[in-house]
Swiss-Prot record:
PANTHER family: BETA-DEFENSIN 123-RELATED, DEFENSIN BETA 118
Cysteine disulfide links: C27-C54, C34-C48, C38-C55
Keywords: Antibiotic, Antimicrobial, Cleavage on pair of basic residues, Defensin, Disulfide bond, Secreted, Signal
Localization per Swiss-Prot or TrEMBL: Secreted
One Gene Ontology CC term in the entry: extracellular region
Designated name of the protein: Defensin beta 118
């Protein structure tokens, strides 16, 4: 009976002392533990269920691992598609009228006078 009374407090206190028996869940890519309060040297990274904090050791750099790895490019030289995509589109539009065209228009326009040819530049 004395052995049972001695074993009962040990079984009750064991989950409080040893985290593996306490059922603390892993968080932050399995580098942290869900706790009510973080210990010294730990930082809160996110919140767990039941209003607990995800405590991660702050002396190490714990970053989330990417879910996918970047696809390596087989050819690093730019191709024709890259050149097409990087071209800035600028369009210059010129209206040029010659004296010959002006004379023909003036003769067809019943002798009206016209000014010298105008050159318009728009971009």
């Amino acid at each position: 009976m004395k052995l049972l009374l001695l074993a009962l407090p040990i079984l009750v206190l064991l989950p409080q002392v040893i985290p593996a028996y306490g059922g603390e869940k892993k968080c932050w890519n399995r580098s942290g533990h869900c706790r009510k309060q973080c210990k010294d040297g730990e930082a809160v990274k996110e919140t767990c269920k039941n209003h607990r904090a995800c405590c991660v050791p702050s002396n190490e750099d714990h970053r989330r691992l990417p879910t996918t790895s970047p696809t390596p490019l087989s050819d690093s030289t730019p191709g024709i598609i890259d050149n097409i995509l990087t071209i800035r589109f600028t369009t210059d539009y010129f209206e040029i009228s010659s004296k010959k065209d002006m004379v023909e228009e003036s003769e067809a326009g019943q002798g009206t006078q016209t000014s010298p040819p105008n050159v318009h530049h728009t971009s």
